[in-house]
Amino acid sequence: MNIGDKAPEILGHDENGNEIRLSDFKGRKLVLYFYPKDLTSGCTTEACNLRDNYTKLKELGYEVIGASVDDGKQHLKFIAKNELPFHLIADTEKTLVEQFGVWGEKKMYGRTYMGTFRTTF
């Protein structure tokens, strides 16, 4: 996804299985952030930062949606544990991460694997 590209209308399904569409946010600003994995330290820090600033973001007219390749059940645990006030897209088939270009080869501790690049739009 590049600046100026049109985002897909159907973003995916949230932690409860509800479809999330881009048109749901018409007239509002949307922060869509991608993260690698629920319940990990870096992703928890990022989600909690957005949680802690959520009221301010809402006052400025923003909505926040997170997305990872974790399933809805895992998202529900992550939301409950960290009291997240926003929805998380369960992109288990990797459709959205591929459309936005945030899925690819990563390296950690000398190991190469496929994963989500931490990215915010």
PLM regions with names:
Residues 1-121:
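Chalcogenol-based redox active-site neighborhoods
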